[in-house]
């Protein structure tokens, strides 16, 4: 299954009790009282079906439609040397208090920038040109992988399923013709602190942009 796909579990019972459906992970696969499964973020989930006497389990696997990018490394708090050891793909460019990695897909490039504060990884930025193949269905790319938690002043906030990483993306902010998605470590309640996280995202985005000339994003 893919994000937002629906499938019905064809369960029947000879008993007098109704059938119940329970998902082991509702972020990946949500199931209705009628047995309709709706796919969420990528991953696997078990749907337990029971009529009170017999119980069966079926596995749901949600896979991505869009594989535009190599997954970023979220080793927040780690040193530059530790990040270098973990990120083994892309072309490395050493930056001022940051590491840049460029990747190509056809004639288009995208970048990951790993920003450090006091020698520790503090933020990760994904950058690509607005006019590029990556722009098509990019929102769905994010929704396949992250939970949308809200919007504030045009910035959309996302969390990973483990609730350890916050992401911010503003589709109307196209500074220098570039889209930026910033990732930062997450702690606390996303809804109550969304404006604070958006403020943090807005403060870190210019730091990503200052590296563009050296990284030569085309």
Where are these predicted regions, by residue range?
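Extracytoplasmic soluble-region selector
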Residues: 1-72, 78, 82, 86, ...
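A cross-family detector of function-defining hotspots
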Residues: 78-218
């Amino acid at each position: 299954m893919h994000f937002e796909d629906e499938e019905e579990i064809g369960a029947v019972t000879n008993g007098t009790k109704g059938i119940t459906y329970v998902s082991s992970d509702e972020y990946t696969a949500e199931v209705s009282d009628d047995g309709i499964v709706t796919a969420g973020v990528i991953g696997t989930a078990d749907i337990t079906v029971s009529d009170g006497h017999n119980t069966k389990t079926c596995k749901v696997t949600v896979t991505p439609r869009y594989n535009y990018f190599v997954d970023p490394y979220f080793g927040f708090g780690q040193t530059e040397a530790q990040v270098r050891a973990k990120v083994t793909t892309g072309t490395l460019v050493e930056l001022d208090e940051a590491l840049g990695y460029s990747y190509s897909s056809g004639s288009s490039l995208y970048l990951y920038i790993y920003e450090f504060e006091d020698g520790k990884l503090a933020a990760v930025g994904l950058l690509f040109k607005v006019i590029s193949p990556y722009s098509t269905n990019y929102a769905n790319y994010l929704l396949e992988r992250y939970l949308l938690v809200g919007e504030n002043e045009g910035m959309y906030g996302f969390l990973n399923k483990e609730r350890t990483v916050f992401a911010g993306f503003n589709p109307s902010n196209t500074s220098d013709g570039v889209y930026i998605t910033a990732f930062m470590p997450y702690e606390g309640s996303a809804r109550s602190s969304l404006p604070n996280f958006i403020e943090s995202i807005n403060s870190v985005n210019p730091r990503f942009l200052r590296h563009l000339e050296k990284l030569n994003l085309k």
